Curated annotation (Swiss-Prot):
Gene Ontology biological process terms from the UniProt entry: defense response; immune response
The name this protein goes by in its record: C-X-C motif chemokine 11-1
InterPro entries referenced in this protein's UniProt entry, alphabetically: Chemokine_b/g/d, Chemokine_CXC, Chemokine_IL8-like_dom, CXC_Chemokine_domain, Interleukin_8-like_sf
Cysteine disulfide links: 27-54, 29-71
Signal peptide feature range: 1-19
GO MF annotation list: chemoattractant activity; chemokine activity
Family membership noted in the UniProt record: Belongs to the intercrine alpha (chemokine CxC) family.
GO cellular component labels: extracellular space
Length: 94
């Protein structure tokens, strides 16, 4: 009986550790994000689609000169125009 109890505790510990691993994969952006960033400051744009760990799309702008990353509001006009341009470029590249 003690062996079964010990195995059960070890199994629960493994499940708890695996469950915690999934919690670390959450949304990158906190809040809605910025409505606009000066286009000349943008080096790269990343679009992260919604997923089981984050229920909404995220748009992340990497800024030039090591100024960091900024989350953009996917619902803003500015961000929608950027997404449209990226999608258009992807279609033309095919």
């Amino acid at each position: 009986m003690k062996t079964v109890t010990a195995l059960l505790l070890v199994s629960l510990a493994v499940v708890a550790i695996e469950g915690q691993h999934m919690k670390s994969q959450r949304c990158v952006c906190l809040g809605a994000g910025l409505n606009m960033v000066k286009p000349v400051l943008i080096e790269k744009i990343e679009i992260l689609p919604s997923s089981p760990s984050c229920g909404h799309m995220e748009v992340i702008a990497t800024l030039k000169n090591g100024a960091g990353k900024r989350c953009l509001n996917p619902k803003s006009k500015f961000t929608k125009k950027i997404i449209d341009k990226i999608e258009k470029n992807n279609r033309n590249a095919r």
